[in-house]
Amino acid sequence: MYKKLRLIIGVATMLSWAGQGNAQETNNTTLPLDAFASLPAMTQATVPLDGSKLAIIRATSKDGDYIVEIRPTNDLAAEPVRLGASRMEITDIGWLNNDKLLVNFRQNIQDGNDNYWVTKAAIVNGDGKGDWKIPFPKENRANFEVLSVLADDPDHILLTYDINNNRIPDVIKYNINTGSTQTILRGNETVSNGFIPDPKGEIRAGSGYDRATNSIKQYARVSGETDWKEIYSNSPNDRENWDFLYFSQENTDEVYVKANLGEDTTGIYTYNIRTGKYSERLFGLKSLDVDSVMLGAKSSNRGQLLGFSYTSKHPTRYFLDANEEAIYQGIEALFPDKFVSLVSRSEDDNAIVIRTSSDKDPGSYYLMSDKKKLDFLGERSPLIKPEHLSDVKFVKYTARDGRKIPAYITVPKGKGPFPAVVMPHGGPWVRDVVIYDEWSQLLAHHGYIVIQPQYRGSTGFGLDHWKAGDKKWGLEMQDDNDDAALYLVEKGLADKDKLAIFGWSYGGYAAFAGSMRKNNIYQCSIAGAGVTDLSRITATLFGASRYGRIYQAPTVKGVSPIEHVKDLNVPLLIIHGDIDQRVPVEQSRLFVDALEKLDKDFKYVELKGADHFSNTLYYRHKTEFYTELLDWLKNKC
């Protein structure tokens, strides 16, 4: 079951680039659709701090049907303890101490015409014995979240829970053995959520909404004190990035924050709660936002600043701690051309779970033991191998108004020009981070070159690029997508007579908008789970999100596809899940109703039992979706 490799961490491995010239050799093997449509065979692996056990989430079918397997790390061939939930889907696991595991799961509930997800968490023994303990099993679990394990108190965890059902959670100390609770902080109208404990478990940060100023405010307090101090306020009029990261280990009065503070890109600073002053910028880049800080998670270095991370083409780490850098470098040397993540570690680093992935690798998991032995645990997608997949390039092209637009290009094997697909991301206030992208690789595997424009309005590239998308839906934002296609044509990579646009969520909106432009450059369009009526968006897309309602909703202005149905001028495939809770299926149904009154070339596919996000699409949904997508591109473009 396990393939074993032996190694010594301290031995340097030379990286050879000599074989790259063969990377584009044509592979005539076309994978079955199952290879892409099957849910990941393995999604997580984790060890407790003593490193004695390994817990894995593993699929038992193409539709997932996930179970947890637990083995001793010193005997991975042993028959595992298996944990499963017959009516619930296991989504996530994490060790609370050396013996107890937190298992998160969800279930889809159909209640008349209503269809929704219920999420719960259970505490189970690592040996599989005893009952599953579900905190607050009968109540509405609004705002339930595990905040922290307590390093000095393995019998308790901190969690938030809306025990009074007033949308304001309290912070509760929960005994994982007995289920007894102690409320240690009551939320209030001022500091109502976003609670963060310091390394000792004291709740010293939180946030709240100020109705008078229509702003979200951040609060913190000095260790041992009860009074909250406002440390930052952000309103729609002065929208900037400001994120509380964690408390400093070196100075209990200081916290790490990610913020702009007058700069175009985010950087890392410390903020002194007592004095109200920021440090100089500790780390930042001119053209990219910083992602976060890397902090120690062991009892010996909890909260210690180890380095920073940011994303250009791939996530990148900048180390401050020499020991941490040496550990990463030693492991990375074993996996040339892979992005390496240490996803779980024991206190002494004698048990480290490693995940590797790349543009052309969906991901594999390994367990390193005693700093010298490596055990292969499994792959996310065993049917997909690097030789089946395509190279991904990161470029910047110039939009028609001169703005530089970053983009990822997935280039199929063979010689261009290729039929092309422009694939704008959802959001739109996100960005693509392409380590492995299933949709672009599926399309490239079938001969399409794919470009993923980080159009204006995308985050990660500074305030100016982010805010440039405000009120530009279907306008300059849409120009950026079209200019991505024209860039491929100009470079000789794409056939100008075989251009398509395909997207999901906001990307679905962009596909709707792209199907009705004058002098259209596309031959067809595929719109997945897209918004068609901007006037309805604040009541649906941002319904549960105060951040969305306050900051993003005022920026959603531009072309509303439902008002331009008559202008549709290319074949349009519309796909939507019938229980989509983010963009209700009515957005597509209304558009289809309008299309049926006109002589337009379109097809509507409704995925039964499918929600909005990719992790709620099952094998049956993906099989139908991918079949329709590839058929439309082949026969309509």
Task: Identify what each model region corresponds to.
Residues 310, 357, 423-427, 577:
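Glycine-rich His-Gly loop
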Residues 193-196, 317-413, 438-441, 445-446:
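Non-catalytic accessory segments flanking enzyme active sites
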Residues 14, 23-351, 359-360:
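Beta-propeller folds
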Residues 455-637:
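Active-site-proximal cap/loop segments of hydrolase catalytic domains
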Residues 1-8:
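Bacterial N-terminal signal peptides that target proteins for export
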Residues 386-497, 504, 538-540:
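Cap/lid segment of the alpha/beta-hydrolase catalytic domain
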